[in-house]
Amino acid sequence: MEKSNGLRVILFPLPLQGCINPMIQLAKILHSRGFSITVIHTCFNAPKASSHPLFTFLEIPDGLSETEKRTNNTKLLLTLLNRNCESPFRECLSKLLQSADSETGEEKQRISCLIADSGWMFTQPIAQSLKLPILVLSVFTVSFFRCQFVLPKLRREVYLPLQDSEQEDLVQEFPPLRKKDIVRILDVETDILDPFLDKVLQMTKASSGLIFMSCEELDHDSVSQAREDFKIPIFGIGPSHSHFPATSSSLSTPDETCIPWLDKQEDKSVIYVSYGSIVTISESDLIEIAWGLRNSDQPFLLVVRVGSVRGREWIETIPEEIMEKLNEKGKIVKWAPQQDVLKHRAIGGFLTHNGWSSTVESVCEAVPMICLPFRWDQMLNARFVSDVWMVGINLEDRVERNEIEGAIRRLLVEPEGEAIRERIEHLKEKVGRSFQQNGSAYQSLQNLIDYISSF
């Protein structure tokens, strides 16, 4: 760590696994460059302060009932959090600024800025009223962050109703999306989404800058276009975990027995299956995935979160005839140490929902993907994997045993898989070069450090 520069940065993550991890990683990056770190967080899904003893953690009430905490409706959860947390956040931030102003002597630190997740709709006006610069962190790709603001309008005014003959056509405004992807991305009434997205857009444009955990090597055209769209400084500092070795900021406890089990498997023979920390699936989806794994006859590591199968506790509905075979070839756990799993020599492929963090973790470990996107940005991420980078196979919405079995065989057994592995090795090297001196992520991070220090 560099010597303290006398500056403090306040960070405010959304309390979702895919949002907390990047924010904590960013905190670690800034701390290594001499900044002191304060993390404001909700009671719900609070990050593990004990894992980061050099940071200051401040908890604010979120007003969620036990029933609301268990909801699988992310849009409802975001609405409740934004409604309930505005006043407690304002009070907490005001006290922090007052405390900093009253400090004297060597202990005095200047609060440089606030960095807030793009899903918080009230942070920009509060920061502005307190004369504190605010930067926005997006956990999406640059491409999706841009396109989410116009997709509702495109769906309503341009692409609906969609003819069967148009399903595979590219969305001209946002390739590589297909027209049929828009319907899956916007699977709720667009009138409900419009006010939320409009607030996010206006808050972002009024902020002092925008941070992405991506780099120009992965999304060059969109980075350039985003600078034109938002007219604010944009920093693509690269996949966050590439700056530091993994440390646990997971909200779930990983099953560490995965690693010794993987140690017993042959190189690049195991298919790793995980659909992230938010996605829920039906009982029939789980059974189709189980049959696909069984019929592929390849060793596998399957993650099934408790409560992730709608209406069920865990995997109790998988038929005994399948479980017997599954137990012979694979291992089923409730949560896995994903970064450690992906870098293991035994992993030959990743059947993933294509959340952005999972996607770039797979790229950075050169693990080819089988894409099974379910919602929101995952469809666009999967298109990048299969159609742009060509480092995976896209199942789209086909949760069918034959499709899953075939994709596993194509990836791990057939010649097609070897070509995909070569391409993802090249992509890994390309992304890796972005972190070297004068690389895009390296330079963007340095620009971010200088920018924050200038406030």
From Swiss-Prot:
CDD domains: GT1_Gtf-like
Alphabetical list of Gene3D superfamilies matching this protein: Glycogen Phosphorylase B (3.40.50.2000)
Ribosomal protein recorded as keyword: no
Uppermost EC category: transferase
Keywords of this entry: Glycosyltransferase, Transferase
Protein known as: UDP-glycosyltransferase 76C5
Binding-site list for UDP-alpha-D-glucose: 277, 336-338, 353-361, 375-378
E.C. no: 2.4.1.-
Organism (species): Arabidopsis thaliana
Pfam family name, one: UDPGT
Signal sequence bounds: none
A single GO cellular-component term on record: cytosol
